[in-house]
């Protein structure tokens, strides 16, 4: 269930950040900020649903998912194919996130 929450959180975070990017860098109208802010609020709320007692650990584990989701956004939304360094780096980050997420803790 945690990975599903992280996946949805990533979509909302990336969409929210992209709304700001589009407004500032792509000269989209200011109304793009409203759905961006809503999306970022949903992202933050979703992370509170992760079953963890430590926010920092939750955010660190989420980081690997965020990187893979960002590379997917690069490919699917922006139309730029990730290169081998993007993919390799993403896999390394996902491995690190998995260690954080699945480590046995008392």
UniProtKB/Swiss-Prot annotation:
Protein name as catalogued: UPF0060 membrane protein RHE_CH01408
Family (UniProt): Belongs to the UPF0060 family.
Chain ranges passing through the membrane: 4-24, 30-50, 59-79, 86-106
Keywords per UniProt: Cell inner membrane, Cell membrane, Membrane, Transmembrane, Transmembrane helix
SUPFAM superfamilies: Multidrug resistance efflux transporter EmrE
Main location: membrane
Subcellular location: Cell inner membrane
Chain segments annotated as coiled-coil in the UniProt record: none
Membrane topology, record value: Multi-pass membrane protein
Domain of life: Bacteria
Organism: Rhizobium etli (strain ATCC 51251 / DSM 11541 / JCM 21823 / NBRC 15573 / CFN 42)
Any one Gene Ontology cellular component term annotated for this protein: plasma membrane
InterPro entries the UniProt entry points to: UPF0060 (IPR003844)
Keyword Iron-sulfur in record: no
NCBIfam families, A to Z: PRK02237.1
């Amino acid at each position: 269930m945690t990975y599903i929450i992280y996946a949805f959180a990533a979509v909302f975070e990336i969409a929210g950040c992209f709304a700001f990017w589009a407004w500032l860098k792509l000269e989209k109208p200011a109304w793009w900020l409203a759905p961006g802010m809503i999306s970022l609020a949903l992202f933050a709320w979703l992370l509170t649903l992760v079953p963890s007692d430590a926010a920092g650990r939750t955010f660190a584990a989420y980081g690997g998912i965020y990187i893979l989701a960002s590379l997917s956004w690069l490919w699917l939304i922006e139309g730029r194919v990730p290169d081998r360094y993007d993919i390799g780096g993403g896999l390394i980050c996902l491995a690190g996130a998995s260690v954080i997420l699945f480590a046995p803790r008392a």
